């Protein structure tokens, strides 16, 4: 797809570097003379002090791609302003997806939670540098719409099956079911139109069950874990953030990270900077040494000492599996993003050295379609909570848990926000054109996939 609505396709990497150099956006600027490190303003869109300038760079990307203003829709100023406010979250989602998908930028600092100056700091990847050669241009030019299953596409990193002997919970983890999530992603308007990412290369017969497609690990590292230089960065793989991870000590956020690998392991070690493994990707519990409450510090440290050799998460087929290897008990549940309503699954103990499925993506998408069709009263839950050392069913508020890990699959969050935006737009007939252009076809495809798998009621 070379053009969108008559607008020549723009390569995100080149476009962003030009915007950083332009000096037209407050807070978007280079941080060194070599122009290899820059900052992007990143205010949370739920804040009350949000204004138009906070979404300026995200809107600019939508305009550059011909996604805004909507073609064929002329609204008076008050309605146009309201429509723009509704679209801001989508602009930010698309910008974030494109930023992660190019493979050209490495997140160095996430200061988005700063109450005064929320921003993120990125560095140009040393493997690619600041220039763009023909190969890189071709990679950014390819659309995910060219990577449909008819080309023999494999599940790739999202659907890795490295350990073939692992027991699966149901026959749905066949090759057809394994392709469900990938196909849904490929039909996504967000990914197809905005990411500028690559198709997964076809595999030779017989490789489907064993191939694990490596991601550029350094591009997903956080400050708590030093970034090793990848030996062979696989820049042709879609670099979508698999999980947003938040670690809290008794309600206090101590780490926010993005896991972009199909396997990760939660570890604790005072010597965390010495960790150099990238398979599975490590997520290191921060030291509780700075906690002001000495009693809390003592018990938190005691629990963390028994996490080793770790808690492993792995994406296998359409399910997320957990394996607890340490002595510290871990309880899990799936609930609402803020944990304010009852969980959709009762809190359960993760048995030690036993693979346990804790989330099913195909179930989420089926429930999401039911929610969209108004056959379901509430939106499906996708936030996974892991309580270390304390039973989540004890009735205490989650912010009282000594060690709590919150996992949010990025793709679930993006799809739910898209459906919610669609629902808002559909209440006003004059703004129907503002809906995501391919939402209907997307959900028709999801319906077909679910019916083919025998999952449709």
UniProtKB/Swiss-Prot annotation:
Give the superkingdom in one word: Eukaryota
UniProt PTM? Acetylation inhibits its DNA-binding ability and activity. In response to a viral infection, phosphorylated by TBK1 and IKBKE1. Phosphorylation, and subsequent activation is inhibited by vaccinia virus protein E3. In TLR7- and TLR9-mediated signaling pathway, phosphorylated by IRAK1.
Induction pattern? Induced by lipopolysaccharide (LPS). Induced by type I interferon (IFN) and viruses (HIV-1 and SeV viruses).
How does this chain assemble? Monomer. Homodimer; phosphorylation-induced. Heterodimer with IRF3. Interacts with TICAM1 and TICAM2. Interacts with MYD88 and TRAF6. Interacts with NMI; the interaction is direct and leads to the inhibition of IRF7-mediated type I IFN production. Interacts with GBP4; preventing interaction between TRAF6 and IRF7, resulting in impaired TRAF6-mediated IRF7 ubiquitination. Interacts with TARBP2; this interaction prevents IRF7 phosphorylation and activation.
Biological role: Key transcriptional regulator of type I interferon (IFN)-dependent immune responses and plays a critical role in the innate immune response against DNA and RNA viruses. Regulates the transcription of type I IFN genes (IFN-alpha and IFN-beta) and IFN-stimulated genes (ISG) by binding to an interferon-stimulated response element (ISRE) in their promoters. Can efficiently activate both the IFN-beta (IFNB) and the IFN-alpha (IFNA) genes and mediate their induction via both the virus-activated, MyD88-independent pathway and the TLR-activated, MyD88-dependent pathway.
Record keywords: Acetylation, Activator, Cytoplasm, DNA-binding, Immunity, Innate immunity, Isopeptide bond, Nucleus, Phosphoprotein, Transcription, Transcription regulation, Ubl conjugation
Q: Which Gene3D superfamilies match?
A: 2.60.200.10, Winged helix-like DNA-binding domain superfamily/Winged helix DNA-binding domain
In terms of CDD domains, this protein maps to: IRF
Protein name per its UniProtKB record: Interferon regulatory factor 7
Q: Where in the cell is it found?
A: Nucleus; Cytoplasm
User: What ranges does the record give for the region Necessary for the interaction with NMI, renumbered to this chain?
Assistant: 238-410
Q: Name one GO molecular function term.
A: cis-regulatory region sequence-specific DNA binding
Question: By which gene is this protein encoded?
Answer: Irf7
Q: What is the effect of changing residue 427 to A?
A: Strongly decreased transcriptional activation in response to viral infection
Give the organism the record lists: Mus musculus
Phosphoserine modification, residue list: 425-426, 429, 431, 437-438, 441
InterPro entries annotated for this entry? Interferon_reg_fac_CS, Interferon_reg_fact_DNA-bd_dom, Interferon_reg_factor-3, SMAD-like_dom_sf, SMAD_FHA_dom_sf, WH-like_DNA-bd_sf, WH_DNA-bd_sf
Extract the DNA-binding region annotation as residue ranges: 9-126
| Gene Ontology CC: one annotated term | chromatin
Task: Indicate whether Electron transport appears among the record's keywords.
Answer: no
Q: Where is this cross-link: Glycyl lysine isopeptide (Lys-Gly) (interchain with G-Cter in ubiquitin)?
A: 329
Which residue numbers mark the cross-link Glycyl lysine isopeptide (Lys-Gly) (interchain with G-Cter in SUMO) in this sequence?
Answer: 398, 400
Major location, coarse class? nucleus
Q: Name one GO biological process term.
A: positive regulation of transcription by RNA polymerase II
Q: How is its activity regulated?
A: In the absence of viral infection, maintained as a monomer in an autoinhibited state and phosphorylation disrupts this autoinhibition leading to the liberation of the DNA-binding and dimerization activities and its nuclear localization where it can activate type I IFN and ISG genes.
């Amino acid at each position: 797809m070379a053009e969108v609505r008559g607008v020549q396709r723009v390569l995100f990497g080149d476009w962003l570097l030009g915007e950083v150099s332009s000096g037209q956006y407050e807070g978007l600027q280079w941080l060194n003379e070599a122009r290899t490190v820059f900052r992007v303003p990143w205010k949370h869109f739920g804040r009350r002090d949000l204004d138009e300038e906070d979404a300026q760079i995200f809107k600019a990307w939508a305009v550059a791609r011909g996604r805004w203003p909507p073609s064929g829709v002329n609204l008076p100023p008050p309605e146009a302003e309201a429509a723009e406010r509704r679209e801001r979250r989508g602009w930010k989602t698309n910008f974030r997806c494109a930023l992660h998908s190019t493979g050209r930028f490495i997140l160095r600092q996430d200061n988005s939670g700063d109450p005064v100056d929320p921003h993120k700091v990125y560095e140009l990847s040393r493997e690619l540098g600041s220039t763009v050669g023909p190969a890189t241009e071709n990679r950014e030019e390819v659309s995910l719409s060219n990577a449909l299953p008819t080309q023999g596409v494999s599940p790739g990193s999202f659907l890795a099956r490295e350990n073939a002997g692992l027991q699966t919970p149901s026959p749905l983890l066949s090759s057809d079911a394994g392709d469900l999530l990938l196909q849904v992603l490929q039909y996504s308007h967000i990914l197809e139109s905005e990411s500028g990412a690559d198709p997964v290369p076809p595999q030779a017969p017989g490789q489907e069950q064993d191939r694990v497609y490596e991601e550029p690990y350094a591009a997903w590292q956080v400050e708590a874990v030093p970034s090793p230089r990848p030996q062979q960065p696989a820049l042709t793989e879609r670099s979508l953030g698999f999980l947003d991870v938040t670690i809290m000590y008794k309600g206090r956020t101590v780490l926010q990270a993005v896991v972009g690998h199909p396997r990760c392991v939660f570890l604790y070690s005072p010597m965390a900077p010495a960790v150099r493994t990238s398979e599975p990707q490590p997520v290191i519990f921060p030291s509780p040494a700075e906690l002001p409450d000495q009693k809390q510090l003592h018990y938190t440290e005691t629990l963390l000492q028994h996490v080793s050799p770790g808690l492993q998460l792995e994406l296998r087929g359409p399910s997320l599996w957990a394996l607890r290897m340490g002595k510290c008990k871990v309880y899990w549940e799936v609930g609402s993003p803020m944990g304010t309503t009852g969980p959709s699954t009762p809190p359960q103990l993760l048995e030690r050295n036993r693979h346990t499925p804790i989330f099913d993506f195909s179930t989420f998408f089926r429930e999401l379609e039911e929610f969209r069709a108004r056959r379901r009263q509430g939106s499906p839950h996708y936030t996974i909570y892991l309580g270390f050392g304390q039973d989540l069913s004890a009735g205490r508020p989650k912010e009282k848990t000594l060690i709590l890990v919150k996992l949010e699959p990025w793709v679930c969050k993006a799809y739910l926000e898209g459906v919610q935006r669609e629902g808002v737009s559909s209440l006003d007939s004059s703004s129907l054109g503002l809906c995501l252009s391919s939402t209907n076809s997307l959900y028709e495809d999801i319906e077909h996939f679910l019916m083919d798998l025998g999952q449709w009621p």
